[in-house]
Amino acid sequence: MEETHAIWIEKYRPRVLEDIIGQQEIIERLRSYVAKREMPHLLFTGNAGTGKTTAAVALAREFFGEDWQMNFRELNASDERGIDVVRNQIKQFARTSPFGGSTFKILFLDEADALTTDAQSALRRTMETYAQTCRFILSCNYSAKIIDPIQSRCAIYRFRPLGRQAVSEMVKRISADQNLTVTEEVIDAIFYVAQGDMRKAINALQGAAILGRDISPDMIFAITATARPEEIDDLIDLSLAGNFLGAGSSLQALLHDRGIAPQELISQLYRAVVKRDLPEAVKVRLIDSLGETDFRLSEGAGSDIQMQSLIAKFVMYGGRNSR
């Protein structure tokens, strides 16, 4: 296996816009900016691993060519959330002249939704003041956390979770380059684990590749500490059938023997419940219980008792439905 020490999410990160998999409508619009040699401020919003950072860097590469690193700067707002990062680092970059004859520079601010409201207000003023010399690309997971005055000054692009076809294409491309054997079942497992996040998909493949060239679904689930879909289904079946001891035993095996994080398990249970053919009243109660348990865990409650309580509620709701 070549370059086993390399981080694959960086090695296989697309360098130009046309190599980005998925988000085709967005990519076409970004390419039109390059063709016109002009662009507005941009706001990229969407889940992690959907291509926001990759698109921003590729756009800068195509705008500036060999000078792209001189005219592009990337900052992460979660590192410094306050107004000082705007007054110092951002303003200092925005006010300097572009390099190499370019008409503007690009500042990419990742996780912009982490900025405080005061910092965002200062950023809005900076965007207005230096619009002639600097274009801003803001990236966030939640656009609702970006103040309206900034949103109104940006062209907004919503990056959707990547579909199975996009994940499959990237997995097959990497597998061919790394001489790995993957089946459609393996791709299904990677897609289930990644949930539209290409970084997760590539990391899962690289983690499994350490164990051997012939990748199996079990390797994917093991390396990512994820329960198989059928294990989640079995846990729900036992609970709704009123088998509290059996469900509790399965729960303990997943949490302690397999090392699956409680909140990851809640996420998987939620996905399974949503897809299930259940009476609406039962589904509502189950999802409400999942949300309550997730909140309690985020507040620091003990995971074992909260997860057992969750299963107990599943058993109760299943029993009521059977009467």
Curated annotation (Swiss-Prot):
Q: Provide GO CC annotations from the record.
A: DNA replication factor C complex
Which Pfam families does the entry mention? Answer: AAA, Rep_fac_C
Provide the leader sequence positions.
Answer: none
InterPro entries in the record: AAA+_ATPase, ATPase_AAA_core, DNA_pol3_clamp-load_cplx_C, DNA_Rep/Repair_Clamp_Loader, P-loop_NTPase, Rep_factor-C_ssu_arc, Rep_factorC_C, RFC_lid
What CDD domains does the record tag this protein with?
Answer: AAA (cd00009), HLD_clamp_RFC (cd18140)
User: What GO terms in the biological process aspect are recorded for it?
Assistant: DNA repair; DNA-templated DNA replication
Q: Does the keyword Transcription regulation apply?
A: no
- Cystine residue pairs: none
SUPFAM superfamilies for this protein: P-loop containing nucleoside triphosphate hydrolases, post-AAA+ oligomerization domain-like
Swiss-Prot/TrEMBL keywords: ATP-binding, DNA replication, Nucleotide-binding
Q: This protein's superkingdom?
A: Archaea
Quaternary structure annotation from Swiss-Prot or TrEMBL? Heteromultimer composed of small subunits (RfcS) and large subunits (RfcL).
NCBIfam families assigned:
PRK00440.1
- State the family named in the UniProt similarity comment for this chain: Belongs to the activator 1 small subunits family. RfcS subfamily.
This protein's name: Replication factor C small subunit
What's the source species for this entry?
Answer: Methanospirillum hungatei JF-1 (strain ATCC 27890 / DSM 864 / NBRC 100397 / JF-1)
